[in-house]
Amino acid sequence: MGDMTNSDFYSKNQRNESSHGGEFGCTMEELRSLMELRGTEAVVKIKETYGDTEAICRRLKTSPVEGLPGTAPDLEKRKQIFGQNFIPPKKPKTFLQLVWEALQDVTLIILEIAAIISLGLSFYHPPGESNEGCATAQGGAEDEGEAEAGWIEGAAILLSVICVVLVTAFNDWSKEKQFRGLQSRIEQEQKFTVVRAGQVVQIPVAEIVVGDIAQIKYGDLLPADGLFIQGNDLKIDESSLTGESDQVRKSVDKDPMLLSGTHVMEGSGRMVVTAVGVNSQTGIIFTLLGAGGEEEEKKDKKAKQQDGAAAMEMQPLKSAEGGDADDKKKANMHKKEKSVLQGKLTKLAVQIGKAGLVMSAITVIILVLYFTVDTFVVNKKPWLTECTPVYVQYFVKFFIIGVTVLVVAVPEGLPLAVTISLAYSVKKMMKDNNLVRHLDACETMGNATAICSDKTGTLTTNRMTVVQAYVGDVHYKEIPDPSSINAKTLELLVNAIAINSAYTTKILPPEKEGALPRQVGNKTECGLLGFVLDLRQDYEPVRSQMPEEKLYKVYTFNSVRKSMSTVIKMPDESFRMYSKGASEIVLKKCCKILSGAGEARVFRPRDRDEMVKKVIEPMACDGLRTICVAYRDFPSSPEPDWDNENDILNELTCICVVGIEDPVRPEVPEAIRKCQRAGITVRMVTGDNINTARAIAIKCGIIHPGEDFLCLEGKEFNRRIRNEKGEIEQERIDKIWPKLRVLARSSPTDKHTLVKGIIDSTHTEQRQVVAVTGDGTNDGPALKKADVGFAMGIAGTDVAKEASDIILTDDNFSSIVKAVMWGRNVYDSISKFLQFQLTVNVVAVIVAFTGACITQDSPLKAVQMLWVNLIMDTFASLALATEPPTETLLLRKPYGRNKPLISRTMMKNILGHAVYQLTLIFTLLFVGEKMFQIDSGRNAPLHSPPSEHYTIIFNTFVMMQLFNEINARKIHGERNVFDGIFRNPIFCTIVLGTFAIQIVIVQFGGKPFSCSPLQLDQWMWCIFIGLGELVWGQVIATIPTSRLKFLKEAGRLTQKEEIPEEELNEDVEEIDHAERELRRGQILWFRGLNRIQTQIRVVKAFRSSLYEGLEKPESRTSIHNFMAHPEFRIEDSQPHIPLIDDTDLEEDAALKQNSSPPSSLNKNNSAIDSGINLTTDTSKSATSSSPGSPIHSLETSL
């Protein structure tokens, strides 16, 4: 979003503002400058200028309690004056830009040049008849008409190049379009709670306006700037803006400034929105960033790395989230290393590219030598000046043949297949309730070997209901009759639950008749409020009598306290505190308990032990969560020191203990069975009591009675994995994790430790690939560390969603199984395409190479090769990459990180089919004219008309590919290749479409396609030979792979994948280096793989900037979304520097970059050079941001 957009945006707002000056008591500019202040400075400014926050509310014509009236004209006016809460997106790339990018492909450029030379030479006629003497070297002289047709081949090559470019550009364009749709879907998902006309409503983040009263709570990501009005115990993590890792406590009198993009780590409250969109603190930075990024991009045109631009725009805004930048870098590394598939593919493409280059170079050399020796040595012809153009034409023809071999050798369709497959899967996964945020997560899921799942809400329905209670010395196995409970106890119980729950938690009547009441807010609290209603009491009157503003002090729930307490002032000025929390934790703090008569009696430790045995354990063994409700009274004077938590949260009086049931989702046991069958271990990590957790794990089928497994509590787990010094040891973790199935009473740190322990373990031969689910703010680290992080779409906090790779829109475990299926399907789709593509490549290269060497001419012409290779492969990648997944995918074990891309079975298929195709093509080439009684096409003069002979070879070749495409649908040696073929209409359409186009090319292609129309019987033979592919496929399937020990596998990532990631850094960068080299165009054939680059770039750009980058339009429609990504954190070795306007720094950076050595376009023009470069450069370019690169300079400048 360039300077232009911003200046328009601002100037428009300023103009409006001056005209509306009198509408509100403060202008946008004033509010904007107010929000730039911090702490006491801000408090002083508010006091001096406005009086207090309430006065600001009055000026903004809003009420701190009722909120805005919410009428359309009022909202519209606010949007006009103060701006809207989104950031103007960057313009998408136009179709023409994409065409221009596709044209940058070096193989295409070489072909264009060759075609133009060929065109030019065909129009140039040397004088005199000596022309005839020149050409005799090669199968006789050409006649006048043939020479005239010389330009056709050149023109045809140019045309097919244009065709290829358009197909590529269209593919990229449609992908961008699709991801934009996905992006807007993510945007609509984001809602925030505001108060309008006294009602609490959820509205999309983009709808928030200045003056709105927003309700904020634990786990929120603030969508706009605002001032704190009231709340309890609110702590904010502002590291995303300031780089300070300490949490900041907010209060009206000390620090009321709340900034967009920061995280609520604890507490709750209300704020009045004062700045939105580009005027909020995040928006201002974002604006600077956008402008800076655009300038950089202009300067960076040379390096042709569109991806780099996205990366650059993202780099500056990182922060050391946990203080330690190194850890963060490691985490980023880990994410990079994640796309195992991308790494394997890049490596494979590079290897194939090398081979292709060598083959094409040899072809050209042999042709040139043969021609010169034959003409000037054997036939002893002098080099005549007038013959030069003819000789040059021969050389150009040889050159075109060489380039053709290269074109065929390079598997352009490969990255395209990945992109299509991922894009297709992501779109379909939305229907299966998986919202994919990082593309490669989809493919990583196919390799998952372990899933660490939360219990609440994922394995269970998260609809809490109290089913047992212990009140007044009696253990009730169902909801007690209210008349059997002492009236005083009952009143205390109702007050304790109604007041000491978030006021946003409510139970509403059902939407449809006969449905269950709706639970809104925290589900455990909903269960307790439901208990109050079941006791035929009502919590609303209690709350209206004691509104939220009147609460004296609140200790919010967090993972350390494991309880929540609220203090209120009684009518006699004394204080009462209500507490609730996990029973074993709260009971330890109780010294009294209410008896049946409602009197408090002493509660000794031995009473507590008895209660645990007789009440809590039986409840837990039924799979219930136990919650204890208690209270404590304090005298009015001296007022207690409320900050001294240890003294306050003690000496409580227990009112009751309830057992809450959270039933297992009916579909979960089946889903877990599928996982286990698919070789995936499911572990449950929960904060619940160990007995509850074990009971639920048995119900889900995670553990089966009588098996050898471990169920540990967090404390015990920590004791076992740490040495005497309290340090975690990997060997100790290795002893535990293989048997561990349930980790109970665990903290988020335990979860992170477990995930890291499993991922770093070298205990098993395959390194583990771990998926994790999380919903809480503090699950962030574990979600980031995991190979795939799943966040809950319904119950998850914004912080968890931001750290995740996939969002489960229905919070359901069975959706994870669908993700596994899709992931494996991506892997299979790519293997299918590889199998098909490599057969085409092997055959075409060998045919062109041997044909050229033996007959001086490639049996498959340049234009035909382009049709086969580029168009057909592009279509084939579409056909094979869109196969829908089936349940059978879940019947085999995960591939793991080291499984080669091309298995032995696939290698058998590739070579087997190549043998069949080569045998037939060479038979046709050397004896075809006798079989069909036609003229031989071998040794034809330079511009001779197309021969039937070579047309038959071309046609047979294409028919064999078509039928082999059907064979390629199965890669595990299955017999029935037609299985489920009609479930994939795209496949059928493409096969039939390709066949139809082939008929048109052969019958009407004429000179441009070097085709001569064929008779019906010749067509029949071609199709018959093609059909033979299917029969031959069955023959190959009969040969047992185990016998073919000599077959090598390919596309394997080296053993480095097995090393824990600390030592991986350089290695990871190597994979990445390959991808980066692809983008830099540093080596001739690397640039020759430029079309691969386009696709990889698209995958990578989407992977990195689908939701994180400014690269995609709308990708930041809401400012909320902008800060929601780790990419926008100032990450640097000196994290604690507030962000400064870095436009000049960025210019420096660009200058530095311009002077840096890799201005590759002119350096490596000779292929041999590039080969040497490859070996010497690796170490240099392997560092992720070499000192000259713009990203590095940006990092250092910040």
Curated annotation (Swiss-Prot):
Composition bias (Low complexity) maps to 1151-1166, 1175-1189
Catalysed reaction(s) here are: Ca(2+)(in) + ATP + H2O = Ca(2+)(out) + ADP + phosphate + H(+)
Q: Specify the taxonomic lineage.
A: Eukaryota, Metazoa, Chordata, Craniata, Vertebrata
UniProt-listed Enzyme Commission number(s):
7.2.2.10
Pfam families, per database record: ATP_Ca_trans_C, Cation_ATPase, Cation_ATPase_C, Cation_ATPase_N, E1-E2_ATPase, Hydrolase
Record keywords, A-Z: ATP-binding, Calcium, Calcium transport, Calmodulin-binding, Cell membrane, Disease variant, Ion transport, Magnesium, Membrane, Metal-binding, Nucleotide-binding, Phosphoprotein, Synapse, Translocase, Transmembrane, Transmembrane helix, Transport
Originating organism: Mus musculus
Question: What protein am I looking at?
Answer: Plasma membrane calcium-transporting ATPase 2
What ranges does the record list as Basic and acidic residues composition bias?
296-305
Which gene name does the record give? Atp2b2
Q: Which residues lie on this side of the membrane: Extracellular?
A: 116-152, 366-398, 851-860, 925-942, 1006-1015
